[in-house]
Amino acid sequence: MMEINRNAPATADGELRIDADPATVFDVISGIDRWPSWNPDVKSVRVEGPVQPGTVFRWKAGPSSLTSTLRVVEPPWEIAWTGTTMGIKAVHVFRFQASDGGTLARSEESWEGLIARLLKGYSRRTLDKGIRGVLAHLKTEAERRAATA
């Protein structure tokens, strides 16, 4: 189990109930190379190996080019990675819990580094918006897949 840095200058978390089982939700988020097909915030992704701890993936989200490394891959309950962009060190964790025939999806992220410290308010708002966005897109795609299964 991986934790974000709760003492980082910028942190955000969110949760959302999804009408799909944890395996379906996990399949959506762990299919990293397919992120651009369901998350309009992700422009491109290149995964450099299988989806397992230690695998690097490079991706573009908004104005940022990111390099991330998978740290935890525990289907269907948790996936987490660390990443860097523009001097920001990020930790992003997704956890899934079965809930009333669906899934409670929780996402947490922390940012460290000079930019995150200097622009705390901006960093926190950006993170919060990103967490809300990815959970909403994840819900839409997982429920779409569950409906066609």
Where do the protein language model's features map onto the residues?
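Hydrophobic ligand-binding cavity/cleft-lining segments
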Residues: 1-49, 143, 149
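Hydrophobic/aromatic beta-strand elements that line small-molecule binding cavities or substrate pockets
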Residues: 14-16, 66-72, 83, 91-98
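A short hydrophobic beta-strand element
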Residues: 53-55, 79, 103-108
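Short beta-strand segments that buttress and anchor functional surface loops
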Residues: 55-62, 79-85
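Short, conserved beta-turn/loop elements at beta-strand boundaries and strand-helix junctions
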Residues: 74-77
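Beta-strand/loop substructures that line and gate deep hydrophobic ligand-binding cavities in soluble
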Residues: 84-140, 149
